[in-house]
Amino acid sequence: MKWKVQLYVGGTTFYENVHAVNRLDAIETAKARNPKARVIATNPDLSS
Protein backbone atom coordinates (compact mmCIF):
# COMPACT_ATOMS: atom_id res chain seq x y z
CA MET A 1 0.00 0.00 0.00
CA LYS A 2 1.16 3.53 -0.73
CA TRP A 3 1.31 6.02 2.13
CA LYS A 4 1.59 9.81 2.04
CA VAL A 5 3.73 10.94 4.98
CA GLN A 6 3.82 14.67 5.76
CA LEU A 7 7.15 15.78 7.22
CA TYR A 8 8.43 19.01 8.78
CA VAL A 9 12.04 20.17 8.71
CA GLY A 10 13.69 23.57 8.59
CA GLY A 11 10.44 25.51 8.74
CA THR A 12 8.87 23.78 5.74
CA THR A 13 6.48 20.88 5.32
CA PHE A 14 6.62 18.39 2.48
CA TYR A 15 5.22 15.00 1.52
CA GLU A 16 7.09 11.74 1.16
CA ASN A 17 5.29 8.96 -0.73
CA VAL A 18 6.36 5.50 0.44
CA HIS A 19 5.31 1.89 -0.10
CA ALA A 20 4.72 0.07 3.18
CA VAL A 21 2.57 -2.66 4.70
CA ASN A 22 1.27 -0.56 7.59
CA ARG A 23 1.43 2.94 9.09
CA LEU A 24 4.40 2.29 11.36
CA ASP A 25 6.47 0.89 8.48
CA ALA A 26 5.59 3.97 6.41
CA ILE A 27 6.82 6.27 9.17
CA GLU A 28 9.99 4.23 9.61
CA THR A 29 10.74 4.40 5.87
CA ALA A 30 10.10 8.15 5.69
CA LYS A 31 12.31 8.76 8.74
CA ALA A 32 15.08 6.64 7.19
CA ARG A 33 15.01 8.89 4.12
CA ASN A 34 14.82 12.10 6.21
CA PRO A 35 16.34 11.40 9.64
CA LYS A 36 16.05 14.98 10.97
CA ALA A 37 12.42 15.46 9.92
CA ARG A 38 9.41 15.43 12.24
CA VAL A 39 6.35 13.42 11.15
CA ILE A 40 3.22 15.58 10.98
CA ALA A 41 0.68 13.20 9.39
CA THR A 42 0.44 9.78 7.78
CA ASN A 43 -2.41 8.87 5.43
CA PRO A 44 -3.01 6.04 2.96
CA ASP A 45 -2.75 7.18 -0.65
CA LEU A 46 -5.85 5.76 -2.33
CA SER A 47 -5.30 7.42 -5.70
CA SER A 48 -4.17 5.15 -8.50
Regions found by a protein language model. Give the residues of each.
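Short, mixed-charge low-complexity intrinsically disordered segments
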Residues: R33-S48
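Short aromatic-glycine-(Arg/Gly/Cys) micro-motifs in beta-strand/loop hairpins
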Residues: M1-T13
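Short acidic, gly/pro-rich beta-turn/loop elements at beta-sheet edges
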Residues: Y15, E28, I40
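Hydrophobic beta-strand residues in large extracellular and virion-surface proteins
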Residues: V5-L7, A20, V39
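A short, exposed loop/beta-hairpin motif centered on an aromatic-Gly-Thr core
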Residues: T12-N22
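Secondary-structure boundary/capping motif
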Residues: M1-K2, A30-R33
